[in-house]
Curated annotation (Swiss-Prot):
The modification Phosphothreonine is found at residues 211, 357, 690, 695. The keyword Phosphoprotein applies. There is a cross-link at residues 330, 371, 723 (Glycyl lysine isopeptide (Lys-Gly) (interchain with G-Cter in SUMO2)). This is Zinc finger and BTB domain-containing protein 20. The lineage of its organism: Eukaryota, Metazoa, Chordata, Craniata, Vertebrata.
C-alpha cells in the first residue's frame, strides 16, 4: 500500500534551500562539507591560521592562499595565513623579556650566580628542569660540576635555538647538557668532540706530514667548518669511535688483563669505523706508534706483577688533548715498575710514600695539565679527569682483597702536596670536577666511559672501624665555620656539657614524656645527631627546676589568688598536668604541649607555599596566609565589623557583651582582658601603698588614697591625641584600638 507523499511546507522548503550548496557554475549539489583548497591546507608551512571572517578588503600575507566557497546568493572567501617565522618571533620576544627581567618566575643557581628565566621555556627545553618544576620548585640548584658559562649558553640555546661551541669548550657543554638532559645538544657535542679526533686521517692525505693536523702533538685544530665551529645542524650523526674515551675506559680496569689490547684494538677499530682502507706500506703517525709502545710496556709489567695497588706510581692512561704546546706521552722505564713493586710492599712507611710522590712529579712534569683547565680541554673526560687521584682517597680506607691494614694520614696527604709542587697545577676551583665529585659524593666515585655512553658507579667498601674522616677530603670539603653554626638552642637552656653539632643538620629532641608518681626529678637529654666521624652521641643536660607529680592534688581554689599573674576568676580548678620545664608553662592537652615544644627546639615543620616561610605551628601558618589573601573572613554580627583573625573577633565581642572576667584584687576593678588587668596591677605596684604579699584577699590595704592612686594623673593615648583622667576610661579607649587591629 503506497503512502501518499506529503507536500513540502514553506518552512521545510526554506530549510532545504539553506542547506543546498551550489558550485560557482550554478549546478546544484547535495548538502556536504564546505569545499577547501587542499593545496593550501597541505602546504608544508609550519603554521596555518584559518580566518573565517570576510577579508575581501584586506591583503593577505606573502604565501597565503585563497579558497572560495560559493553559496546561494553569496560568496565567502577564506584566507589561509602562513606565518613562517612565528615560532622564532615568539622565542625572540620571550628572550627580550628575560633580558629585561619581565615575567621571570624561575631562578637557576650555580656557583653562587643566579639566572632568571621562564618556567615554560625551561620545562620545554630540558627534562631536568621539567622534573624540578613539576615538583613545585621555583629555585633550582645546578650541580657544581659545570661552569656558569655552560649553563648560560644552554639557556640561551633554549630561547634562540642557536648554540655556538668551540672545540675547546665542546666537552664542557657536553657535560652541562648531560645534566640538563638536552639530547640534541648531547648528540651534537659528542659528534664535535669525536670529529676532533676523526679529522686527523683526512689530514694525512692532504698535508703529507708525519704528524697530522688536529693531533695532540700538532697543537692545532682540524679543518674548519660550520660543523666544527659548533652550529647545530640536523643531519645524520657519523658513527665515529672515540679513541680518548676507549683508552680512558680501559684505564679504569685497575690493572686487569683487559689493558693488554687497549691500544691496537681501539686504533684498528677507529680506522674501520671511519671507512679508511688500511695501507700496510704507509707508516703510522708517531703518536699512534707511541701508543703501541706503551701497550707493550704495560703487557710486560702485567705479566710480571700479580696484582696492583693504588699508588701515584701506577701508569696513567694516555690522554689525547688539543693544547697549545706539544704533549709527550709518558714513557715508563723498567726500574719504575720495580720501584712500584717495592712501594706496594712498604706502603705504610712515610719515607717511601714521599719518595714515590717526588718521582711521580718528576716523571709527569711534561704530561701534567692544570686541574682547573681540565674542563676546557678538547677531548679530556669531564668527570673522571684524574682517576688515580680520585681512587687514592679510597686506597687507604678500603685496601684490596679485604686487607684490614690501617690507613696512614701521611700517605693520603701527599695528593694535596703534589698539586702545590707542580708549577703548572692550579688549585681546584669551584667548577673543578675533583672538588665537585668528592664534596657531593663521599663514598661513590663516578667515572664516565664515553665508548659505551653510560656512567659507571663504583661503590668502595668503606671500613666501618675507621673513626676519622679521610684526610684527603680536607682539600675539597668546605670546613664548617663553627661547630654549632646551625644549632638553635633555647635562651633558657643552660648546661656545662659541651654541645657538639654537625653543620647543616638540625636536631630534634625527643618529646618529653610524663613522669610517674614517686619518681625523682630526672634531667632531660637533648640528643644530638651522631657526627660522621664516629664519635659518641653528645647530650645536653637540662636539670628540672622541680616538676610536681601529676597525681598530686592542686591547692584548693581561692576566691582571689594571692598572685596577680595567676588570679583568674575562671579555670582555677582545672588540672594542667603537662608543664614545660623550660618556661614553666602548663597545658591541659598533650597535643598543645607537643606544639609548644617546637618553640624551644626551633623546629618549623609548617611552610608557606607562596613565600616559603616556615612556622612552628599550623595556626601561625594559617594566620600568615591572610597576609597573602587579605580576606577578612570573621565578621561581627552586631556591628558588621570584619577581622582577619578569629581571636580578634572574640576580643571585639567582649565589648558588646560587656564581659569583664578579670578583676583587680586591690581595687575590685574588672577588666575584659588579662593584659589590661596586668597593666592595671602594674600601676598599683608602682605606688607606695602596695599591700604586702601576705595580705588576705578582699582586705583594704593602706589608706583610702591607695584606691584612688591614679587621681590627678592624665592618661594620653599613644595612637590618637585623646586624654583621660580615669584609668578605666583610658583602658576602654585602648581596647578600641586593639579591636581595630
Amino acid at each position: 500500500m503506497l503512502e501518499r507523499k506529503k507536500p513540502k511546507t514553506a518552512e521545510n522548503q526554506k530549510a532545504s534551500e539553506e542547506n543546498e550548496i551550489t558550485q560557482p557554475g550554478g549546478s546544484s549539489a547535495k548538502p556536504a562539507l564546505p569545499c577547501l583548497n587542499f593545496e593550501a591546507v597541505l602546504s608544508p608551512a609550519p603554521a596555518l591560521i584559518h580566518s573565517t571572517h570576510s577579508l575581501t578588503n584586506s591583503h593577505a600575507h606573502t604565501g597565503s592562499s585563497d579558497c572560495d566557497i560559493s553559496c546561494k546568493g553569496m560568496t565567502e572567501r577564506i584566507h589561509s595565513i602562513n606565518l613562517h617565522n612565528f615560532s622564532n618571533s615568539v622565542l625572540e620576544t620571550l628572550n627580550e623579556q628575560r633580558n629585561r627581567g619581565h615575567f621571570c618566575d624561575v631562578t637557576v643557581r650555580i656557583h653562587g650566580s643566579m639566572l632568571r628565566a621562564h618556567r615554560c621555556v625551561l620545562a620545554a627545553g630540558s627534562p631536568f628542569f621539567q622534573d624540578k618544576l613539576l615538583l613545585g620548585y621555583s629555585d633550582i640548584e645546578i650541580p657544581s660540576v659545570v661552569s656558569v658559562q655552560s649553563v648560560q649558553k644552554l639557556i640561551d640555546f633554549m630561547y634562540s635555538g642557536v648554540l655556538r661551541v668551540s672545540q675547546s669548550e665542546a666537552l664542557q657543554i657536553l657535560t652541562a647538557a648531560s645534566i640538563l638532559q638536552i639530547k640534541t645538544v648531547i648528540d651534537e657535542c659528542t659528534r664535535i668532540v669525536s670529529q676532533n679526533v676523526g679529522d686527523v686521517f683526512p689530514g694525512i692525505q692532504d698535508s703529507g706530514q708525519d704528524t697530522p693536523r688536529g693531533t695532540p702533538e700538532s697543537g692545532t685544530s682540524g679543518q674548519s667548518s660550520d660543523t666544527e665551529s659548533g652550529y647545530l645542524q640536523s643531519h645524520p650523526q657519523h658513527s665515529v669511535d672515540r679513541i680518548y674515551s676507549a683508552l680512558y675506559a680501559c684505564s679504569m680496569q685497575n690493572g686487569s688483563g683487559e689493558r693488554s689490547f687497549y691500544s691496537g684494538a681501539v686504533v684498528s677499530h677507529h680506522e674501520t669505523a671511519l671507512g679508511l682502507p688500511r695501507d700496510h706500506h704507509m707508516e703510522d703517525p708517531s703518536w699512534i706508534t707511541r701508543i703501541h709502545e706503551r701497550s707493550q710496556q704495560m703487557e710486560r709489567y702485567l705479566s710480571t706483577t700479580p696484582e696492583t695497588t693504588h699508588c701515584r706510581k701506577q701508569p696513567r692512561p694516555v690522554r689525547i688533548q688539543t693544547l697549545v704546546g706539544n704533549i709527550h706521552i709518558k714513557q715508563e722505564m723498567e726500574d719504575d715498575y720495580d720501584y712500584y713493586g717495592q712501594q706496594r710492599v712498604q706502603i705504610l712507611e712515610r719515607n717511601e710514600s714521599e719518595e714515590c710522590t717526588e718521582d711521580t712529579d718528576q716523571a709527569e712534569g711534561t704530561e701534567s695539565e692544570p686541574k682547573g683547565e681540565s674542563f676546557d680541554s678538547g677531548v679530556s673526560s669531564s668527570i673522571g679527569t684524574e682517576p688515580d687521584s680520585v681512587e687514592q682517597q679510597f686506597g687507604a680506607a678500603a685496601p684490596r682483597d679485604g686487607q684490614a691494614e690501617p690507613a696512614q694520614p701521611e700517605q693520603a696527604a701527599e695528593a694535596p702536596a703534589e698539586s702545590s709542587a707542580q708549577p703548572n697545577q692550579l688549585e681546584p676551583g669551584a667548577s673543578s670536577p675533583e672538588r665537585s665529585n668528592e664534596s657531593e659524593m663521599d663514598n661513590t666515585v663516578i667515572t664516565v666511559s664515553n665508548s659505551s655512553d653510560k656512567g659507571v658507579l663504583q661503590q668502595p667498601s668503606v671500613n666501618t672501624s675507621i673513626g676519622q674522616p679521610l684526610p684527603s677530603t680536607q682539600l675539597y670539603l668546605r670546613q664548617t665555620e663553627t661547630l654549632t653554626s646551625n644549632l638553635r638552642m633555647p635562651l633558657t637552656l643552660t648546661s656545662n656539657t659541651q654541645v657538639i653539632g654537625t653543620a647543616g643538620n638540625t636536631y630534634l629532641p625527643a618529646l618529653f614524656t610524663t613522669q610517674p608518681a614517686g619518681s625523682g626529678p630526672k634531667p632531660f637529654l637533648f640528643s644530638l645527631p651522631q657526627p660522621l666521624t664516629g664519635q659518641q652521641t653528645q647530650f645536653v643536660t637540662v636539670s628540672q627546676p622541680g616538676l610536681s607529680t601529676f597525681t598530686a592534688q592542686l591547692p584548693a581554689p581561692q576566691p582571689l589568688a594571692s598572685s596577680a599573674g595567676h588570679s583568674t576568676a575562671s579555670g582555677q580548678g582545672d588540672k594542667k598536668p603537662y608543664e614545660c620545664t623550660l618556661c614553666n608553662k602548663t597545658f591541659t592537652a598533650k597535643q598543645n604541649y607537643v606544639k609548644h615544644m617546637f618553640v624551644h627546639t626551633g623546629e618549623k615543620p609548617h611552610q608557606c607555599s607562596i613565600c616559603w616561610r616556615s612556622f612552628s605551628l599550623k595556626d601561625y601558618l594559617i594566620k600568615h596566609m591572610v597576609t597573602h589573601t587579605g580576606v577578612r573572613a570573621y565578621q561581627c554580627s552586631i556591628c558588621n565589623k570584619r577581622f582577619t583573625q578569629k581571636s580578634s573577633l572574640n576580643v571585639h565581642m567582649r565589648l558588646h557583651r560587656g564581659e569583664k572576667s578579670y578583676e583587680c584584687y586591690i581595687c575590685k576593678k574588672k577588666f575584659s582582658h588579662k593584659t589590661l588587668l596586668e597593666r592595671h596591677v602594674a600601676l598599683h605596684s608602682a605606688s607606695n601603698g602596695t599591700p604586702p604579699a601576705g595580705t588576705p584577699p578582699g582586705a583594704r590595704a593602706g589608706p583610702p588614697g591607695v584606691v584612688a592612686c591614679t587621681e590627678g594623673t592624665t592618661y594620653v593615648c599613644s595612637v590618637c591625641p585623646a586624654k583621660f583622667d580615669q584609668i578605666e576610661q583610658f583602658n576602654d579607649h585602648m581596647r578600641m584600638h586593639v579591636s581595630d587591629g
